[in-house]
Amino acid sequence: MRTEIADALLRAVLPPWAVGAARADDVSGPLFAVERALCEGAGPRREGEFTTGRWCAHRALVRLGGSPVAVGRGPRGEPLWPPGVLGSITHCPGFRGAALCRAGPARALGIDAEVDAPLPARVRDRLISTDEAGRMRPEVAGERLLFSAKEAAYKACSALVGDGRVPRLAELRILVEPGRHGPGTSGRFRVRVPALTVDLDGRHFEGRWKRSHGLVLTSCVILRPGTEVPRAWRPGTEVPTAQG
């Protein structure tokens, strides 16, 4: 897969006011010194995932209107972005990507990429509810879409709340909009979170998905209540925030 195709696949699941960068193959760098230290001792596969994920992050920062800076790692393994920037990194066999937006209408952003294949039965039974799975049939590997959507939503949630308050994947309920869900299609999804989850409201989750080129890609944005999200903003500029 060419880099421009990987870029287009990621762009297809992002809101118009977010940017991304992706590629299918690994690169050897460059990395900032602090980033290089984070992958010391890693095996070749993990080093390739990490290095290429950071390469995508640097490229996305430029597309957002900034300059490449070191993307560190937080206590939960999450990427650490510059002030005022929200983002997420994902990787799976044949795909690495990073997506960013500026804080404002958005409170958090998560993305996920998966190989479009059926979930192992033990994973499906543990994480996908009967109701969720029933909505996707008879589409082949529809449960992989549900799993990816949960991963994207989980990443967005974990950016807002501490480890002990993040809903488990099994607790996140994904409602995919009606329509075709098979390979070559795309659409939206909604997220339901546990009623007692502090600081999260499923009404403010915006999810997008695409199945193409043997992959499932998803994104989930948590929006700020009471904020009208613009259709787009010019990269590198500040975005309006809710008053009060």
Each language-model region and where it sits:
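Core catalytic alpha/beta fold that binds nucleotide/phospho-ligands
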Residues: 1-244
